């Protein structure tokens, strides 16, 4: 379907099923963290999926391309991003499979029925508070800093919206790992799988991928490290596979 592009917007190829996404590089474009999260997550065709803080809809689009879930929903508080996500859904003729809802993560348990999703994903803001921000209302700031929602907001609403035995997938920063694990256990989302992401084999990890299960038993698997680059500008083979190149 043809869709209207606003000022400064562009269409990018997602390398999956011929899907494309509308983005505005002056506002916010999806990053590698969102793509790696969809490579780490799993879903079944019968699953219903929710992406919290969906931005321009990258995670629902890639999850639909990979797993063909029965229905996917993206929740986004910024209307401009939600509008781009809706137009990307229309661009790929996926209106019957993906819904984009404008709303606040803190209100998610009022927007959606309790225990209504098999799978929830989230690429939340990583940085605590507004330290160093010149404009906390700027779209990139909202996406990266806990201006409008906190880690606890994400985890507590996920616990209410997941079905018993449902799976939660999140990408975050390793420096907050202790807090993340404490928060998941507090809300009875049992950590089941974790993978650290390293930019290079000799560098410290800069991302962590986590899977938790609502009401799951206490047993966690730590997967082998995921290395992004083998040389500057050259991805490792696993990264090419995740991107679909």
What are these regions (language model features)?
Residues 148-199, 203-205:
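Conserved Class I SAM-dependent methyltransferase catalytic core
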Residues 2-45:
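Class I SAM-dependent transferase core
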Residues 40-133, 156:
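Conserved SAM/SAH cofactor-binding pocket of Class I
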Residues 15, 43, 94, 185-188:
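Short, structurally constrained coil/turn elements
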Residues 22, 99-101, 192-195:
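General small-molecule cofactor/ligand-binding pocket signal
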């Amino acid at each position: 379907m043809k869709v209207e592009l606003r000022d400064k917007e562009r269409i990018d190829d997602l390398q999956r099923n011929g899907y494309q996404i509308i983005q505005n590089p002056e506002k916010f474009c999806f990053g590698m963290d969102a793509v790696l999260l969809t490579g780490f997550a799993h879903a079944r065709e019968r699953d219903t999926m929710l992406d919290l803080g969906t931005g321009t809809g990258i995670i629902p689009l890639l999850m639909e391309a990979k797993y063909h879930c029965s229905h996917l929903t993206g929740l986004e508080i910024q209307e401009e991003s939600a509008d781009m996500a809706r137009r990307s859904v229309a661009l790929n003729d996926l209106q019957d499979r993906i819904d984009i809802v404008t709303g606040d993560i803190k209100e998610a348990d009022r927007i959606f029925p309790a225990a209504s999703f098999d799978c929830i994903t989230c690429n939340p803001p990583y940085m605590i508070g507004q330290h160093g921000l010149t404009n906390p209302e700027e779209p990139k700031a909202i996406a990266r800093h806990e201006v409008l929602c906190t880690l606890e907001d994400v985890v507590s609403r996920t616990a209410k919206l997941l079905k018993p035995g449902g799976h939660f997938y999140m990408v975050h920063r390793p420096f907050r790992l202790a807090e993340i694990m404490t928060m998941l256990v507090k809300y009875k989302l049992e950590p089941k799988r974790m993978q650290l992401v390293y930019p290079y084999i000799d560098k410290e990890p800069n991302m962590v991928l986590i899977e938790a299960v609502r009401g799951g038993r206490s047993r966690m698997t730590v997967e082998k490290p995921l290395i992004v680059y083998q040389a500057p500008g050259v991805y490792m083979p696993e990264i090419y596979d995740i991107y679909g190149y």
